[in-house]
Amino acid sequence: NYNFLYYLAYCNLTCAVAREVVEHYGDRTAEHPVGTGPFRLAFWKRSSKMTFEPNPNYREDLFDGTPPADDAAGQFILSRLKGKRLPLVDKVEVYVIEEPQPRWLAFLNNELDFLERVPNEFANVATPNNELAPNLRKRGVRMERTAGMELTYSYFGMKDPVVGGYEPEKVALRRAIVLGQDVGAEVRIARKNQAITAHSPIGPGALGYDPDFRSTATEYDPAKSKALLDMYGYVDCNGDGWRDLPRKSAADECRPFTIEYASAPSAQQKPLDENWKKNMDAIGVNMTFRKAKWPDLLKESKAGKLQMWGLGWS
């Protein structure tokens, strides 16, 4: 496997470190990253700030690149930096600003030099018609628009008694929920057209990505969703407007059926939740939301306590 060494050094996947590091830090190993990159972690305050300083042991590495001839911005950067030794700066400070409005205002107020991405809520203001706004251009702001190597998805807790399992009715339930979710509306409304529909687990920029591949995994068909739910007994048996769990016979009592989706209490998450709620209402599925901070949800997820949650990788 020619990619094996790459996998060992790819921290999003494995990030292998010396045994002594793990033995010394134990469960806190992730708080003490060890690597051979251009920077090392100098300060970290959870959910607040990280400071990186140059790694004195970093190898000799000179800036280089091969931007296309028609990439004016790339050619300009190359002309200024080609041949200079990396890293180019003495310190990098990363601030964790969870809410989009304070993050955007901090950038406008020159408190930040770089914003990784424009918050979706301000995309139409900052980049009308996907072009940098004239007022920002006058201030010397530059924008680089790329398809990020990132993929977001929603998962089902496969050990959950309601949505998990491999019985035919459970498989049908998960398929029905997927068929009832309008991903196109999520892209247009919740993500302000700053995303594309994923048709595979491989995102743009990753080896194996095929922009022409189309999958039925993101098919939106509420009629088919309702038919599947009806077929496997997820029907409204008490007339309250919501579907109930399947019954073995008509004489059995109705059992309420609710899907709980975990999500963070953020402005960015709100339109995503609203899209889910609207879509599930349309097929008669009662969806509620489990609100908690991301680190807390991660702990619950690892413990197998979440029915559904949205995650991603980049």
Predicted feature residues:
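Extracellular/periplasmic solute-recognition and catalytic clefts
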Residues: 42-53, 80-81, 93-160, 184, ...
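Short, well-ordered beta-strand elements
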Residues: 37-40, 50, 89-95, 255-264, ...
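Surface-exposed binding/hinge segments that line
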Residues: 1-22, 27, 35-51
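Periplasmic binding protein-like
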Residues: 131, 261, 279-314
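Short, hydrophobic alpha-helical packing/hinge segments within bilobed ligand-binding/sensory domains
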Residues: 103-104, 173-174, 297-301
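Append "and occasionally in soluble cytosolic enzymes with long acidic Gly/Pro-rich linkers
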Residues: 43, 48-64, 76-83, 167-278, ...
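Short beta-strands and strand-coil junctions in structured, solvent-facing domains, enriched
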Residues: 2-6, 59-61, 103, 113-115, ...
